[in-house]
């Protein structure tokens, strides 16, 4: 009885962690996509003030803006 209860509890905890990590991954990916869209747009329109700020205030890694400075 005790072992069964602990096993069920463990499964619930693991599934909760898995679901939370999945939703975090989705949020991060959406952010990265928005940043990439900005990056692509600003390659074309480089003289717009927002694009200049975007290009200057990014931490660039392999051509992608990974974080705001």
Curated annotation (Swiss-Prot):
Source organism per UniProt: Dictyostelium discoideum (Social amoeba)
Signal sequence residues: 1-21
Name by which UniProt lists this protein: Uncharacterized protein DDB_G0272238
Gene Ontology terms: cellular component: extracellular region
Lineage: Eukaryota, Amoebozoa, Evosea, Eumycetozoa, Dictyostelia
The keyword Secreted belongs to this UniProt entry's keyword annotation: yes
Keywords: Secreted, Signal
Predominant location category: secreted
Subcellular location: Secreted
